[in-house]
Amino acid sequence: MNVKIKDLLPIGSIVILKDGEQPLMIYGIMQRDGDGGLFKKAKEYDYVSVLYPQGHLGHGMTFLFNHEDIKEIIFRGYENEERTKFLNELSEQYEKQ
């Protein structure tokens, strides 16, 4: 993760990735790709998303990516005090690791 937690886009944000054309809607942050298995560590991504406007189309149709992969932010999702508190708590947890 190269982006600071407080700089992550909010859920509901819609982006286009570099080398991409289809908009994606972010529905989660700080996601892991699987459990890593016996001999490898799970890879962590900044975001998990689905196609927009289609939404979730089934298994294998979610997209994990990092902030640096974003080419364009089309829409910034909803932000409020609860989100700020959540990001502060998340940031504290990562600092402990």
Task: Locate the predicted segments by residue.
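Short, solvent-exposed secondary-structure boundary/capping segments
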Residues: 32-44
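A general structural signal for short secondary-structure junctions and capping/turn motifs
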Residues: 7, 14-17, 40
